[in-house]
Amino acid sequence: MAIFERRRFLQLTGFAAASAASLLLPRSVWSQTDTSRKFQSNPFALGVASGSPTHESVVLWTRLVESSLDSRAVVVRWEVADDDAFSRIVQSGQHLATADLGHSVHVELQNLQSDRWYFYRFMVGDAVSSIGRTRTFPKAGAVVEKLKISYASCQRWETGYFTAYKHMQAEKPDAVLFLGDYIYEYPGNPVSALRLPSSTSSFGFVLTLDDYRNRYAQYKSDTDLQAMHAACPWLMTWDDHEVQNDYAGLTAGDSGFADVFSKHEDFTLRRAAAYQAYYENMPIRATALTKSLAGLVSGAEMRIYQRVDVGQLASFYMLDPRQYRDRQACSKDGKLGASMVNPAKCTDWLDPKRTMLGAQQESWLSHELASAKQRGSVWNVMAQSTLFGLRDNIAGNGQSFFNDGWDGYAPARKRLTDALQKHAVYNPVMLGGDLHENWVGYLKADYSQNAAAKAAPAIGVEFCGTSITSTAGSSAVEKTPERLAENPHFVFADAKFRGYGVVEFSSKQLTTTLRTVDNVRAKTTTVETLAQFVVTAGRTVIERV
């Protein structure tokens, strides 16, 4: 029997109607709401979240999980208030949670006041969710004195506890930028795992829609992660492990375990299941599903890239470097996925047609950057899933680059830096993840390793963050000093510690603080500052403080 049942996906053609249920359902449906229904366990066990904030709108999220839930739809009530006692309710309503969407709830609030904090909660039967806190951003053109964001990535369940989020919550950020690898699709190793993932798949892999739903439910059971979601809105992008290690567009990657994934007969269906589960479990807008759920089955996009403005202080460009990319160039022995590659031996390395973002997203980003000066944003932050700057992994003679990152898509990287220069974008900042290491450095117009390119002034700064729990490996820790010396456009690197980053913006400067926990394998941790950097607006200089 095939791992994926195509008929199951083709039944999900009514997504558009389901997503707008709160507006279109007849009064007779709302009259069936059973406020006296008793639940044996908490249907809100996965917590609450909010995301995609604008100056007047934000998405509220929850997903019901309870043993008595079946294929029937459930009417969920929601409230938004000015205070956590809900004595001043500003909006309320009902939403239909359908089984076809995993009983997820996405409420897209509108007509909120700008630059305000709100409280929200959900109710079904006798159950009431935990209280979430969210906010809107200032209006376009508004003068904003300060903004604090945290960024994080790469949280593998079995390699540690998500205690970094407990410390992040204490930072009281205005928003969290999550930069990929929210879940991992691998089976757990009972020998080395700290805590094992569950899976309904006979292989122990995440392969089906139910598998993905269960994996998200497991990760979201972490109380520190839940609390951070409830504390402020999140802006999201993904990397590969939300689907499969090293996948590229509609090309399967490398499972690392007997090639179970790469031998699957229809990767498009597997990606569709992963994308649907991502939507079901994240506070993102319904417009991300550009051609409904049915479109995913035939390879349609799930558009998660977007621009979010915070008055005149900052514009955030949330990018998607995974969904539209070409296959990795010159992977060894014809293998799927990533390899370390010597570009001198790879004829495709500098092919100008190769893309990381895809033609449409590249065009969109260029257009957005072209209007950045007119918007007047002091800081222009591109948030994506991996290291942007060139990193040669061999000291001295010879070259070795990772073909799954931007190094493997050098012409696409050059097009982006050309756009930054062409449009004279103010204060470009690149944020990334993926490596499970901290790297801090300069954006270069040209990463060619000749003397002129190396001597040319920088055009922006980059902060690539470490992981929440995922390990970097002992060899990465050992080789970091020589890799840093080999790539002088970077000023700091560390592969030893897990944690997150905090960026504080003002009109005069940004301050980035790298925060690390002492031991992800302990349920109680301490947090320390690994390093702190200041960049003055208008000066592309990174100062360590």
Named regions from a protein language model:
Residues 2-545:
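Metal-dependent phosphoester/phosphodiester hydrolase catalytic core
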